[in-house]
């Protein structure tokens, strides 16, 4: 039996759009009528409008005092061929106050055949003749990638990274334990995960990454995935110009200095004015702006203030020769009227692509936020800076901005972010504003003269900036509501056909472990309605979508790593989530991840929460497939929790603390400390608090390196026993209907 990687042959169905090109050539004898021509010579321009496409209104430049203008300007419209598309042509006269309509004509696009190109004359007022050149073609190369497979760049990265990892594992594990690494195919895929938890997660993850870097574990990892606070550390690390040549130790020193300041210092009038003016520029270009944009700027100014122009795309240079693990970031797409615990689509971000695996739709990072229609960009914007994405990835804190800044009266609303979030519904997070303020279809024909328009825009800008500044620096009504604080971007799936849904694991028998029974799937971990509507599709008619912190559903980025295309063997996860006390069970987020995985038919080891009762609180727990022979595609999970146990006694693994000063620095609680220095809402870490949390997670990681090494050795053995791991035979494909028919009909070697 031959084994294949079938994902590249699964067809993600999508309908092709049409590209309608209009060249406005010229006009002759433009007139305002006999009386009008006596008073003024026309200043003509042409406006084109098709109501059925998002970027619907376009216009030529105007010519002063010209009755025979020659424009030769080309415009493109992306159209849905199933719609009744009608081009409306309006001849306009530019005036100082309000432009004047000289004539209107219409043209049914359906009268043209695909591949046809022709010149069409239009007569206005029985005198003026205008010539347009029109052509219609199929958009056969959309800007979205429709596929269940990983992108070619990630595939290339994986191949290069495996060669690097093979040598690193041999060095780390020694000749005896690595004798099974004969080729790149024998190399297990290791992923490192960081949870959310605000600056607590960021600081804790900084200690983790330092330990993984020093121990050589990081050199054996293919992926590093983060959520919320962990993404802030990943962004800081990967955007640093000296990484990876300079390791986390020196970069963490810079981080400690950056987070020692009160974030309120960033809200000086001069800086606030600069923030809001840059957001006005974004808003006036036609992009949505929310409080998350401002929060992203504050996070960026705190963590990456000397590289605020860095983009996600620019991080490719950090992995272009597979010298580092590939960073993966995440947020959620949510609906305005549905709880994020019931419905949420996971959006993944890498330096190579951004997209949603649930729909098999991906795009280059520089296109995220641009206007799309039917998979094609209709209006391209500049790539959003990394700090904007940092605000989106951690947007729970913009939703609860009053807690972050300590606005009066807000401190009594709950001691942890999780308690606050329990009271949030998506309708609190997301404004119900489905309209487009930049929607050309609602604009009147014509525009004001540029001089008059600039005066109006200046007044409008001043008013908007004033409102935003007052909302930001005062205890205004905006701080007493969570409305509209979610990130908002143009819907890149606008107009697509989602009649066919694609399970995250579209191949049967891919996960052969014992499946959950109905009672287990029905059992609630955190909420009776959790994941109830996760199979629902996105609204492809909504012009904008809301993107929020993934921690609002569960606080570990497992969905990125569990994609079967990535074939991860070993997951090392670090959970910095808040708990009621230091002695509380630490598995809530992991149990939610397990339930989500089972509902999506993805391999996941059985999480036994009673291990806490049997073994007590530990620095890490190992969860393995019960039957590796049957569950050959199930990963092993090493789950680190935030706990101060052995660190109190040892300053390094095996090195006891001796002096009172050494013992005192390590004698602290995480969640039981009444002063809450490690609160989820603490955005200022004095050096001592930073060092304590950083050094704790650095120690906990190093103290369990042997556990990680042992799991690596076992993963190598699993690979040896199952050389076809994460490959699938065609006879086991449940979703044959998704496959390219030509591929299915080919004879197999």
Swiss-Prot record:
Pathway: Membrane lipid metabolism; glycerophospholipid metabolism; Lipid metabolism; arachidonate metabolism; Lipid metabolism; prostaglandin biosynthesis; Lipid metabolism; leukotriene B4 biosynthesis
C2 domain span: 6-122
Post-translational modification: Phosphorylated at both Ser-505 and Ser-727 in response to mitogenic stimuli.
Phosphoserine modification, residue list: 2, 434-435, 437, 505, 515, 727, 729
One annotated GO biological process: phosphatidylglycerol catabolic process
Top-level class of the enzyme under EC nomenclature: hydrolase
EC number: 3.1.1.4, 3.1.1.5
Catalysed reaction equations from the record: a 1,2-diacyl-sn-glycero-3-phosphocholine + H2O = a 1-acyl-sn-glycero-3-phosphocholine + a fatty acid + H(+); a 1-O-alkyl-2-acyl-sn-glycero-3-phosphocholine + H2O = a 1-O-alkyl-sn-glycero-3-phosphocholine + a fatty acid + H(+); a 1-acyl-sn-glycero-3-phosphocholine + H2O = sn-glycerol 3-phosphocholine + a fatty acid + H(+); 1-hexadecanoyl-2-(5Z,8Z,11Z,14Z-eicosatetraenoyl)-sn-glycero-3-phosphocholine + H2O = 1-hexadecanoyl-sn-glycero-3-phosphocholine + (5Z,8Z,11Z,14Z)-eicosatetraenoate + H(+)
Active site: 228 (nucleophile), 549 (proton acceptor)
Cellular component terms per the entry's GO annotation: cytoplasm; cytosol; endoplasmic reticulum; Golgi membrane; nuclear envelope
Binding site for Ca(2+) 2: 40, 43, 93-95
MF terms (GO), sorted A to Z: calcium ion binding; calcium-dependent phospholipase A2 activity; calcium-dependent phospholipid binding; calcium-independent phospholipase A2 activity; ceramide 1-phosphate binding; lysophospholipase activity; O-acyltransferase activity; phosphatidylinositol-3-phosphate binding
Domain of life of the organism encoding this protein: Eukaryota
Keyword Repeat set for record: no
Residues found modified as Phosphothreonine: 268
Keywords from the named record: Calcium, Cytoplasm, Fatty acid biosynthesis, Fatty acid metabolism, Glycerol metabolism, Golgi apparatus, Hydrolase, Isopeptide bond, Leukotriene biosynthesis, Lipid biosynthesis, Lipid degradation, Lipid metabolism, Lipid-binding, Membrane, Metal-binding, Nucleus, Phospholipid degradation, Phospholipid metabolism, Phosphoprotein, Prostaglandin biosynthesis, Prostaglandin metabolism, Ubl conjugation
Subcellular location: Cytoplasm; Golgi apparatus membrane; Nucleus envelope
UniProt note on regulation of activity: Activated by cytosolic calcium, which is necessary for binding to membrane lipids. Activated by phosphorylation in response to mitogenic stimuli.
Annotated region (Phospholipid binding), positions in chain: 1-178
Residue span of region Disordered: 409-457
Cross-link (Glycyl lysine isopeptide (Lys-Gly) (interchain with G-Cter in SUMO2)): 541, 606
Residues bound to Ca(2+) 1: 40-41, 43, 65
PANTHER family from the UniProt entry: CYTOSOLIC PHOSPHOLIPASE A2
Protein purpose: Has primarily calcium-dependent phospholipase and lysophospholipase activities, with a major role in membrane lipid remodeling and biosynthesis of lipid mediators of the inflammatory response. Plays an important role in embryo implantation and parturition through its ability to trigger prostanoid production. Preferentially hydrolyzes the ester bond of the fatty acyl group attached at sn-2 position of phospholipids (phospholipase A2 activity).
Name this polypeptide is given: Cytosolic phospholipase A2
Lineage: Eukaryota, Metazoa, Chordata, Craniata, Vertebrata
């Amino acid at each position: 039996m031959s084994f294949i990687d079938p994902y590249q042959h699964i067809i993600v169905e999508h309908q092709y759009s049409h590209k309608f090109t209009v060249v406005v050539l010229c006009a002759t004898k433009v007139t305002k009528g006999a009386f009008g021509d006596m008073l003024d010579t026309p200043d003509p321009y042409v406006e084109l409008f098709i109501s059925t496409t998002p970027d619907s209104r376009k216009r030529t430049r105007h010519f002063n005092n010209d009755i025979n203008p020659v424009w030769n300007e080309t415009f493109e419209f992306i159209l849905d061929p199933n719609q009744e598309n009608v081009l409306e042509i309006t001849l306009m006269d530019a005036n100082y106050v309000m432009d004047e309509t000289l004539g209107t004509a219409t043209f049914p696009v359906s009268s043209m055949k695909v591949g046809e190109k022709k010149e069409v004359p239009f007569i206005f007022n029985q005198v003026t003749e205008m010539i347009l050149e029109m052509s219609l073609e199929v958009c056969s190369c959309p800007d979205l990638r429709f596929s269940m497979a990983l992108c070619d760049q990630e595939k290339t990265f994986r191949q290069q990274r495996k060669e690097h990892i093979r040598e690193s594992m041999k060095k780390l594990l020694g000749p005896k334990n690595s004798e099974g690494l004969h080729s790149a195919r024998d190399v297990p895929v290791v992923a490192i995960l960081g949870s959310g938890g605000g600056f607590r997660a960021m600081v804790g993850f900084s200690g983790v990454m330092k330990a993984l870097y020093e121990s050589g574990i990081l050199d054996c990892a293919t992926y590093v995935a983060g959520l919320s606070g962990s993404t802030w550390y990943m962004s800081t690390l990967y955007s640093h110009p000296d990484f990876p040549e300079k390791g986390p130790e020196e970069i963490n020193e810079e981080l400690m200095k950056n987070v020692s300041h009160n974030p309120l210092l960033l809200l000086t009038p001069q800086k606030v004015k600069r923030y809001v003016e840059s957001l006005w520029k974004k808003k006036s270009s036609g992009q949505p702006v929310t409080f998350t944009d401002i929060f992203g700027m504050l996070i960026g100014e705190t963590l990456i203030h000397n590289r605020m122009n860095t983009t996600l795309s620019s991080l490719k240079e950090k992995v272009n020769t597979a010298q580092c693990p590939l960073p993966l970031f995440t947020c959620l797409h949510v609906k305005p009227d549905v709880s994020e615990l019931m419905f949420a689509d996971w959006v993944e971000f890498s330096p190579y692509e951004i997209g949603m695996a649930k729909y098999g739709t991906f795009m280059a990072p520089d296109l995220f936020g641009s206007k799309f229609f039917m998979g094609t960009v209709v209006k391209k914007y500049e790539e959003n800076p990394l700090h904007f994405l940092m605000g989106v990835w951690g947007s729970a804190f913009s939703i609860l901005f009053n807690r972050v800044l300590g606005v009066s009266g807000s401190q009594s609303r709950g001691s942890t972010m999780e308690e606050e979030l329990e009271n949030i519904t998506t309708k609190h997070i997301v404004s119900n504003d489905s309209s487009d303020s930049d929607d050309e279809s609602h604009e009147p024909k014509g525009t004001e003269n540029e001089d008059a328009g600039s005066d109006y825009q200046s007044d409008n800008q001043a008013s908007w900036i004033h409102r935003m500044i007052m909302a930001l620096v005062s205890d205004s009504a905006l701080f007493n509501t969570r409305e509209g604080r979610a990130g908002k971007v143009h819907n890149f799936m606008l107009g697509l056909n989602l009649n066919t849904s694609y399970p995250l694991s579209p191949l049967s028998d891919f996960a052969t472990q014992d499946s959950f029974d109905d009672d287990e799937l029905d059992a609630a971990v955190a909420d009776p309605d959790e994941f109830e509507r996760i199979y629902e599709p996105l609204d492809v008619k909504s012009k904008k979508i809301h993107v929020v912190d993934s921690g609002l559903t569960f606080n570990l980025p497992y969905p990125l790593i569990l994609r079967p295309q990535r074939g991860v063997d070993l997951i090392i996860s670090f959970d910095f989530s808040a708990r009621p006390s230091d002695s509380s069970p630490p598995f809530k987020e992991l149990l939610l991840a397990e339930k989500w995985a089972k509902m999506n038919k993805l391999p996941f080891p059985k999480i036994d929460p009673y291990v806490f009762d049997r073994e007590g609180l530990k620095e890490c727990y190992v969860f393995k497939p019960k039957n590796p022979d049957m569950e050959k595609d199930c990963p092993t999970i090493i789950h680190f929790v935030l706990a101060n146990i052995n660190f109190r006694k040892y300053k390094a693994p095996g090195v006891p603390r001796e002096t009172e000063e050494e013992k005192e620095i390590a004698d602290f609680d995480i969640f039981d400390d009444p002063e809450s220095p490690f609160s989820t809402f603490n955005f200022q870490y004095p050096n001592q608090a930073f060092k304590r949390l950083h050094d704790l997670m650095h120690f906990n990681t190093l103290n369990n390196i042997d556990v990680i090494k042992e799991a690596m050795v076992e993963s190598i053995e699993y690979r040896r026993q199952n050389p076809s791991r994460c490959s699938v035979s065609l006879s086991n494909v449940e979703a044959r209907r998704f496959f390219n028919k030509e591929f299915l009909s080919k004879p197999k070697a």
